[in-house]
Structures are given as C-alpha cells and as structure tokens.
Curated annotation (Swiss-Prot):
GO BP annotations, alphabetical order: nonfunctional rRNA decay; nuclear-transcribed mRNA catabolic process, no-go decay; nuclear-transcribed mRNA catabolic process, non-stop decay; ribosome disassembly; RNA surveillance
Subunit record text: Monomer.
Family designation: Belongs to the eukaryotic release factor 1 family. Pelota subfamily.
Cofactor dependence: a divalent metal cation
InterPro entries: eFR1_2_sf, eRF1_1_Pelota, eRF1_2, eRF1_3, Pelota/DOM34_N, Pelota_arc, Ribosomal_eL30-like_sf, Transl-rel_pelota
Name of the protein in question: Protein pelota homolog
Signal sequence annotation: none
Domain notes: The N-terminal domain has the RNA-binding Sm fold. It harbors the endoribonuclease activity.
Cellular component terms (Gene Ontology): cytoplasm
E.C. number(s) listed in UniProt: 3.1.-.-
MF terms in GO: endonuclease activity; metal ion binding
Classification via NCBIfam families: pelota
Amino acid sequence: MRVTKRDLKHNREGEISLTPETLDDLWHLKYIIEKGDLVFSLTKRKADNAADKLRPEKAEKKTVRLGVRVEDVEFHKFSNRLRVHGLIEHGMDAGFYHTLNIEDGTNLSITKYWKKDQLERVNEAEAASKRPKVILVAIEEGDADIGFVRHYGIEIYSHITQSSGKGEGTLREVFFSTILDQLTHAMSGTESVVVSGPGFTKDDFMKYASSKNSDLVAGILVEDTSSIGMSGFQEVLRRGAVDRIMEESRIARESSLMDSLLKEIALDGKVAYGMDEVKQAIDFGAVETLLVADEMLRLERESGNIDGLIQNVERSQGKMVVFSTEFEPGQRLHSLGGIAAILRFKV
C-alpha cells in the first residue's frame, strides 16, 4: 500500500490518501473502511442530462471523482475488487447512491475518525509493500503444492501431480521440471522461497533445480515437514521458517499467539476466551494481549460495543492483535467465540 497523504488531527480525525497495490491491501481496506466514512475516488457514472433521459440507452459513462458516504463494504477476493457502496455527497448526482469499485492501483482518500488499530493496519500494509513476499513449495513423492503467503492467509497457487506409467526416472524429471516451471512463473523476482516436505524428495528437487537455475536456488530455504498441502504450509509457519524471512509476518505472529493461547487453555492458565470472560479480565486490568477475529471486530464495531473494551486494554498497557478468519489461527479463534486474551495473571 502506498500512502500519499496524511492529514490527521490530534484526536485521529482526518484524511488519509492511499493506493492499494495488492490483494492484501484490499483485504486491509475491508477492515479500515466502515459505515459513515467519506471515501473519494475516481469512478465511472452515467451523465444525468436531458438528452440522456430521453435516450437512456445512449447515455455514456463518464470518469468523475465522487465522494461517497459509506453504507456497505464488500471484499470480492476472486475478482480482486473491493466494492464501497453509499450515498454521493460530493460530485455529480449528489443524493443518489453509487458503488465505488476499488482495485489495486486505485487512488482513494478516506476521511473519518481513525481508530488506533486501523492506523496500525495502514502502517503495516505500507511497510509490507517494502518487504519481500514469500512463496511456499511443499513436495513429496509424486505430489507438490505451491502457495503464496498473504496477509489474509495462505493462497494455493497450484497443485502438481506426477504422471504414472513406465519410465519412472523420466517421469520424475518431468515432475520436477513442472514444479520448477510453475515456481519460476509465480515469481516476479523479489520473493523469498521456502521448499519443504517429508523425506528426500525436496532435496532431490533442489539438486535438479540447481542444475537448471542455480541463481534461483541460491536463495531458497529448505525445511523438513511431515506433510505437504495446507497442513505442510502451516507446519512451515509454526517452525518459524517464514518468520526468519519476514520477521514481522502477520501469519507467523498469529500462529505463535494461537499456540500460546491453546497451551494456556490446556493448562487452565492465564487465559480468557469468549466475550464474558474477556470483559471480566479487562475489568481486572489483567489483559496482556487481546486477540480478536476480524469478523468479530467488524460486527461488534457496527453495534458500537467493542471500542470501549479496546481502549480499556490500551489504558492498562495491553495490546491488541486482529486475526484473519481466512487463516487457520483466526478460524480457531472464531470457534472460541471470536475473542480471547492472554493474561498477566489468572482471573
């Protein structure tokens, strides 16, 4: 995410102009833009004049800059688009409804009261644009998966299966060649790569890849895991391989925090989960780290019930981490009620 303007008052009210550059940035914006915000962006809208009313099928869409008072936000991951719907307050057809389609590369400005976690999201996305992406490759005999580490979770890029038949050596070389081709195609030149899997297949692949593209292989990190697929990718994250590449990786941090939370739950230790337990812990000033699922935060924020709790945590020197429900730790947190806390002391 590229930030081009910050104009905020001491109470965090004001305008930030920015440009999303990736699908991750659009996901962040889903939780930054909320009902009541004023969002400006270039958009296309049919000109509303007398001639057009007589011949509506002839009306042409013009590119105009509109300011929309937000009523609804939808993230369409598979079309790489964020849809911001609301009432036009500035520009042509004020008083009518319009939907802004925000894609990567769209310049927009957001005027609102900025909550602390929303500013942290902007800062995180801006910093992430300067860090390398990570590509995960999980290989076992006959099967391989390639995935991207995203802010919202792991996105499977491709699954490769070795053909069966005679000439096992040749088929294995074709299998490795396909993996290497897919990996090369997935890279733009700035990513880091982790190759993982059980047994020696990954090592054999690395030898093959080295013979074909030694420059690419030189920067690859190799990790042992017990499986491939999504569970293998999760194992790579838990082992800290991604953390060693991106120290501030959102996903690695959430995995580590969820492991700590589950250990405390198993020990009946310094932990609270579910809204009632967490509220009680906040009242006692016991919360060290508040864990909130993004969907829970959005829903509670719409009802106006959660910001006071967050402020109380911050006043007692606690911190908050928002989990993505697109990713396994966030899904686990959702199953625990969408909110939990690691405590300073047992309540």
